[in-house]
A protein has these predicted regions:
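Short beta-strand immediately N-terminal to the catalytic nucleophile in serine-hydrolase-like folds
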Residues: 126-128, 151
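Glycine-rich nucleophile elbow surrounding the catalytic serine of serine-hydrolase chemistry
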Residues: 128-138
Length: 170
């Protein structure tokens, strides 16, 4: 059983390698028209910035969306358009970027997301895709977190020990 092949998601999606470019275009178009504060610093490293999108009127709270990418790829700029749904329902949306493995441990990324959440208006709803789903699930017990919705999270990390990617994950 080739574990690297099992975790190569894009290879099994028709035209999957083109998706990131499409996501980036959609996200950039959304940012161009959104009521937002972009690249708000929450920590000392260059990647510790977040985009904060504001709804019309007083927000009901904040949805925090954490991007995926197996802890080694992507940043907030690919996902801005996903803020549209919560914004339409009166929620602020915060999307943090974070340092990537192998420069940091996964536990440090979790701490960075926790730091990004400090000072956000609650109640907080956390969501994230893939590795982002894993990260928000780790934060489910934090104060002021009312709901957590991991989307297709990497929930069992044990199989990753058998991948080449494991050399970068710490």
């Amino acid at each position: 059983m080739d574990m690297d092949d099992r975790f190569a998601n894009a290879a099994y999606i028709p035209d999957g390698m083109s998706y990131p470019e499409k996501w980036a275009r959609q996200a950039a178009a959304f940012r161009a028209t959104a009521k937002a504060e972009l690249d708000v610093r929450y920590g000392p490293s260059a990647r510790q910035v977040m985009d904060v999108f504001h709804p019309e009127g007083t927000p009901k709270g904040t949805v925090v969306f954490v991007h995926g990418g197996y802890w080694v790829a992507f940043d907030k700029s690919f996902w801005s358009h996903l803020a549209a749904g919560p914004l339409a329902h009166g929620w602020s949306v915060t999307m943090p970027s974070y340092d990537l493995c192998p420069d940091v441990h996964i536990s440090e990324i979790t701490q960075q997301i926790e730091e990004a959440m400090r000072g956000l208006q609650g109640p907080l709803r956390l969501t994230g895709h893939s590795a982002g789903g894993h990260l928000v699930a780790r934060l489910a017990g934090m104060p002021h977190v009312a709901r957590v919705v991991p989307i297709s999270p990497v929930a069992d990390l044990t199989p990753l020990l058998q991948t080449q990617m494991n050399a970068d994950l710490r």
